[in-house]
Amino acid sequence: MSAPAFCKGILSFGQPWPQFDSMAASPVIGEGQSAIADSQDPRAVYQTLLAADALRYVTLQVTGSKGSGHPGGFASSAEAHASLMMLGHTNIVTEVGHHAPGFYSAMFLDGSLAQMGIHNMDDMMTRFRERHGLLGHLSGAIPGLLAPAGPLGQGQHFAMAGALLHPGKLFPVTIGDGGMGEPYVLNSMMHFHTAYPDITNFLPVLVWNGYSQEHHSMVSLFDNQAMTDYWRGHGFEEVILVDAKEFDDAGQSGAYVDSTLFSHGQRLKFTAAVLAGVDRAAQSALGGKLTAFIIKQLKGAGVHASGAKSHNLYPKDTLDQPHIYESLQKRALPEQAWAIVRDNLSRAGGGPACQTAVTEQELALTPLPALEWQHFNVGDKAVPATAMGAMVAQVGLADRRFVVTNADGNEASAMKNINDALKIRHPTPDPLYNQEPGGQVYEPLNEDACAGLAAGLALFGSRSLWLSYESFAINGWPIIQTVTQAMAELRRRTPAVVCMFTAGALEQGRNGWTHQRPEIENFFGAMMRNGNVYLLFPPDANAIQAAYAHALDSVNKGIVIVASKSLLPVYMTPDEARTAVRTGAGMVHAAGTGQGGRIVFAVTGDMVLLPVMQAARQLEGEGHAVQVVSVVNPRKLYRPGDVAWDSVAQPDGEFMSDSDFNALFDGDVLIGVSGGPSAPLEPVLLRTRAPRRDVFCWKRGETTASADELMDFNGLTADAMAARARQLLADNQS
């Protein structure tokens, strides 16, 4: 038999294995089937091992083609990954970005990559680790793949989100022993299981290979009992471990061994144990038990090196080097084996993953009714966070799939109205705390768990909201950044991942500097240039409703709303607020004759407007014209060329025009003011034509008795701002 067309470019073919004619005469997954019928069937075991070695071979050749990439970690999971696919469980995610070449190999072997023009091995090598090709790490941009993976310790969130949205489907997530504690992998699953005890259809698959990237893993000294106990201690009722060492007939030393060095018979026995174990684990997870599967096998099994030395390839590790080419020869399969592997994997799960993965179609959203606004009068006072909470409650009552997450507690964020309406999800009913087992508010004391579930739900197509104290958002932000970047290249529409951070630094005087960390706004500010990230600063209770309504209507974006939980003045009408969110900024004050010069204050934030307004009144009394402009959506104030907006999915190329910008910000002096750091003011400073300009912003935290005292400590006072404006005007005239 000649090799199938997709094998064009494969460098080495091998001889048929023993019993090939009887065990691989035809695919064990027949036409019209989606999985093997019996995991105990010797033919199923045999063909699962063929798939495992095919995965290893493609992984090593494609990484060798560029002298780049990471073959070793995935290689030690090959039997488990092949087993999952052969059993029809193809909605697989991972927390290990370094397993990308293996996941790409799986998508190549099931035919999914043909959707992006990769039809054979030559195509795959050409497109590997290239722009518009197979990205360096996993992304939902690749047909058949559900979620991104780069930073360790995130994949479990995607598996849990998938399980919550799709009962009855299994969501395996591979986890490396190097990344197992990085930082909250098991902790987040434990929290989720407490809140959602009936959602067990996600399956952690621990790839326990004894090594991390450059050394022995920190759990390499665990014995099998200790590892099993560790998972049981985190709430897993069923822990199934298959240890390659128990099948070794090659006399390998150490606790971690390479199954590809076994005799053929022992390789089949090991594969049979893995296949049966994965099948048992899958049925357990789908049957209502929190379950984990562990494959224990040496890192680098079957590729060019072992242990941490197999982790990645360097430029010298190319296909013409003996250690690479000889390793490929050892894994080489006969031509007819490749046809068997393709037929099996393209049928597993009901078809190629590019057709059957749950993320290949948009999830239908529950239609929302017209949301009721609270219309606050300009000049009155209202709490922004509470105003938003009322709107959030309406969303949750209309969309029962909607989840709100908050590690610090909605009540502490002046958003108790969310808990009143939607209830905190907890197995202990308690009306005093608004707790119910079926609640829609997820409040584990773990920012990563909160951000992770919200981000995972948004990526997989459902509405969610992550709420946090601004000071502690940094502990959950990494997965939000991962998801916003994934959304930028997603091939489908999905709801924006929406965050609201309150209890800003100026509100936290008595709590001291541990609760005063607004510097994260600089992080968000830098990400605005990504093209699909928006940092919103509503100045009042009307504007925060406009900001949240805007976020609800957005797709494939990351939206961060920063607002206070304090009683503050209302500056904008609802219509003015909607316009400011859409266009980028809005005037909240304009007065004075202008005989002494025109001063413009460009302000991000709400509470910091208090001293700005005081400074404005001082200056107006001296004959100056003063405009106070609330910078509500600074992403809209950049110039188009400043932002990679045209490189992202669902692009937004609307920016404030020069004429509109100049109408708001033209003056003799422009002073940017922020209650946090200065980066969000960058677009204003880039575009202003004011001949004199300066910035007042946060410096550092301190324990104070009031917001006024804390602003004074940071130089954010009316007197300081007015004095600086006078000096700049004088400089302008000299």
Predicted regions and their residues:
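Cofactor-binding active-site loop characterized by glycine-rich and histidine/acidic residues
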Residues: Q40, T48, L55-S65, F74-Y196, ...
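Conserved internal helical-beta-strand scaffold that buttresses enzyme catalytic cores
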Residues: S2-S68, M116-A149, A339-T356, E360-L363, ...
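Short, highly selective alpha-helical patches that border small-molecule cofactor pockets
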Residues: S77, F103, H157-A159, N224, ...
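Non-catalytic terminal/interface segments that mediate subunit docking, oligomerization
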Residues: L50-A51, D343-P495, A577-G596, G605-M607, ...
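Thiamine diphosphate
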Residues: M121, T126-L203, A276, N410-F524, ...
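Glycine- and acidic
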Residues: Q40-A44, L60-S68, H89-T90, A141-A147, ...
